[in-house]
Design a protein with these regions (language model features):
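Beta-rich carbohydrate-recognition and catalytic domains
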Residues: 1-109, 113-163, 170-191
Length: 191
C-alpha cells in the first residue's frame, strides 16, 4: 500500500470530524496471517449490538509461487473503530462451501447486512468455470458461523463476467442489487 505498484492489499484507515480534513491512522487490516498472507481485499463493515465494529473482508492466499493457485476466502475482524483483531477461526467462509464449478480464485468482496428478521446476511461475488458471474448468499445468527444459502443472481445476460463488490439492500419498497462487472464487452456507448 506504500507504493505505486500492485502488491499485497491492506485496509487503510482514516478518521475525520468534518469529512474534509482527515487524520491517517495505521492500517486497519494487514496481510499477516496464513489465510490472508497475500492480501486483505475489499469487503464491508457492520456495527454489532454491543457497539463493536465487525469487518468482513476477502483474504488472499497463494500457493505454488507466482504461477500457482490463489485461494480467496471470507474473513472477519472485530474492533472498536481504531484497533481490530482478526477472528481466531478465520476464514469464516471458504471454498469448501462453493457449489461445483464455481471458482475458488474468484470468490470475493463480501457485503454484510442485518435483515429485518435479525439474521446477518452477506452477498459475495463469484464466477463459474465459463466466467459467468454469480452472487452467492450466506446467513449467520451471530456473524461468526456462516451457512451457504444459494445463488442470489446469475449473470446469464453477458453483463460482464466476474461480478465484483456486490451490494444488496432494501430501498423504497424494493430490493436493489449493485455490482461492478469485470470484462464488459463494448456495446454502443457502454464499455
Amino acid at each position: 500500500p506504500y507504493n505505486l505498484y500492485w502488491d499485497s492489499m491492506h485496509w487503510g484507515h482514516a478518521i475525520s470530524k468534518d469529512m474534509v480534513k482527515w487524520e491517517y491512522l495505521p492500517a486497519a487490516l494487514a496481510p499477516d496471517e496464513v489465510y490472508d498472507a497475500d492480501g486483505v481485499f475489499s469487503g464491508s463493515a457492520i456495527t454489532l449490538s454491543d457497539g463493536k465494529q465487525l469487518l468482513m473482508y476477502t483474504g488472499i492466499k497463494k500457493e505454488g509461487g507466482e504461477h500457482g493457485s490463489e485461494f480467496q476466502t471470507q474473513c472477519i475482524a472485530v474492533g472498536d473503530g481504531l484497533n481490530y483483531t482478526k477472528y481466531e477461526n478465520n476464514p469464516v467462509i471458504d471454498e469448501t462451501v462453493l457449489p461445483p464449478g464455481l471458482s475458488k480464485n474468484d470468490f470475493r468482496d463480501p457485503k454484510i447486512f442485518k435483515d429485518d428478521d435479525g439474521i446477518y446476511r452477506c452477498v459475495v461475488g463469484s464466477c463459474d468455470d465459463d466466467r459467468v458471474g454469480h452472487i452467492l448468499t450466506f446467513s449467520s445468527a451471530d456473524c461468526f458461523t456462516w451457512k451457504y444459502e444459494g445463488i442470489l443472481i446469475r449473470n446469464d445476460e453477458g453483463f460482464g463476467r466476474m461480478w465484483e463488490c456486490p451490494d444488496f439492500f432494501f430501498l423504497d419498497g424494493h430490493w436493489v442489487f449493485l455490482c461492478s462487472p469485470q470484462d464488459m464487452l463494448p456495446s454502443g456507448l457502454e464499455y
